[in-house]
């Protein structure tokens, strides 16, 4: 009878990553009952950074979910363990949040193990999800917009009394403003480490302002740049009137 490892397929990876992935799958086979294992992330895509980890998605039939973070042969790995029903719920939730992380892992990852038709069925659903726009409710988008504006206003208020807090809040609001560019366009949010490059592809001048903001320590300059970024993205620099829909 074939073992789980006998039924695995392996991607073409650099030796250290290949060894780590095989060790991780061995750990999974020994401790879980997988019907599917999918490896994804920058290591699999061939463009890892020095601290990149293996992203490994495990599909099992047990009605439990778990996350394991563990080193294998010196390489960090994040292991996500879920039953099919939970995965489908993640698809819907992440479509609404604008960050389809689960769908992206399943659709673009390498199938190391597939012992059940549900693996390919989930991958097909994931691919379909990625062709569809986010389902973020307009009210949540407006709340995020207001949060960015209010945070900038707080940063400006604190520039004399508490400069450190002003620096902190200004940094927070810039990320929210840049996210609004994608929410307003009804497209998925990029990963945080890809955010500035994704902005540059849409608006090079806006990206240059963001880079200048993060590269300067001068609070006055930072707040001036934050104001320009606010004007370009959320269109407001502080409190504004709006009304949410009534809910029970």
Enumerate the language-model features and the residues they cover:
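Helical scaffold of the NTase/Pol beta-like nucleotidyltransferase catalytic core
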Residues: 1-35
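Conserved NTP/Mg2+-binding pocket subregion across the NTase superfamily
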Residues: 2-13, 68-160
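Conserved nucleotidyltransferase catalytic core and NTase-mimicking acidic/glycine-rich helix/loop elements
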Residues: 3-4, 130-248
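Generic structural marker for isolated residues within well-ordered, non-membrane alpha-helices
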Residues: 25, 66, 178
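A positional/architectural concept
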Residues: 25, 35-36, 45, 89, ...
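Amphipathic alpha-helical interaction elements
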Residues: 26, 111, 214-218
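Catalytic metal-binding acidic patch
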Residues: 37-82
């Amino acid at each position: 009878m074939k073992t789980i490892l006998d039924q695995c397929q392996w991607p073409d990876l650099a030796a250290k990553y290949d060894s780590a992935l095989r060790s991780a799958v061995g750990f999974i086979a020994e401790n879980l009952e997988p019907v599917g294992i999918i490896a994804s992330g920058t290591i699999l895509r061939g463009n890892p950074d020095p601290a990149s980890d293996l992203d490994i998605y495990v599909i099992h039939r047990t009605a439990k979910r778990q996350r394991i973070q563990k080193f294998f042969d010196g390489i960090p790995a994040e292991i996500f363990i879920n039953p099919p029903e939970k995965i489908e719920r993640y698809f819907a939730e992440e479509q609404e949040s604008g960050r389809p992380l689960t769908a992206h892992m399943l659709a673009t990852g390498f199938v190391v193990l597939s012992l059940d038709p549900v693996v390919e069925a989930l991958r097909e659903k994931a691919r379909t999800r990625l062709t569809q726009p986010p389902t973020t409710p307009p009210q949540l988008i407006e709340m995020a917009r207001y949060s960015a504006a209010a945070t900038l206003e707080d940063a400006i208020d604190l520039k004399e009394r508490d400069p450190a807090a002003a620096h902190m809040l200004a940094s927070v609001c810039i990320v929210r403003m840049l996210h609004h560019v994608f929410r307003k366009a009804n497209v998925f949010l990029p990963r945080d480490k890809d955010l500035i490059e994704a902005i540059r592809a849409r608006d090079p001048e806006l990206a240059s302002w963001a880079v200048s903001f993060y590269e300067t320590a001068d609070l006055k300059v930072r707040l001036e740049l934050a104001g320009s970024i606010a004007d370009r993205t959320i269109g407001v620099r502080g409190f504004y009137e709006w009304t949410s829909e009534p809910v029970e």
